[in-house]
Amino acid sequence: EDLQGDAVPETSATKDDNEXPEMIPMSLPPELEINKPFILIIYDDNTKSPLFV
């Protein structure tokens, strides 16, 4: 069977392919101010123990 007609043409790398990606403009995240004490506990159900307190 002749597969030469189905071959994908090779392309060379251009200058644009080697440049660094462009910077994506992003806004700063909202500022979070906590005025009261709080407790955060991360608990693992498999081991039945706190992972972070």
Swiss-Prot record:
InterPro entries: Serpin_CS, Serpin_sf. GO terms for cellular component: extracellular region. The record marks M26, S27 as: Reactive bond. The keyword Glycoprotein applies. It is found in: Secreted. It comes from the Eukaryota. Its main location: secreted. Plasma. Residues 1-28 are annotated as: Disordered. GO terms for molecular function: serine-type endopeptidase inhibitor activity. N-glycosylated; contains biantennary glycans. Keywords: Acute phase, Glycoprotein, Protease inhibitor, Secreted, Serine protease inhibitor. GO terms for biological process: acute-phase response. The reactive center loop (RCL) extends out from the body of the protein and directs binding to the target protease. The protease cleaves the serpin at the reactive site within the RCL, establishing a covalent linkage between the carboxyl group of the serpin reactive site and the serine hydroxyl of the protease. The resulting inactive serpin-protease complex is highly stable. Belongs to the serpin family. This is Alpha-1-antiproteinase 1.
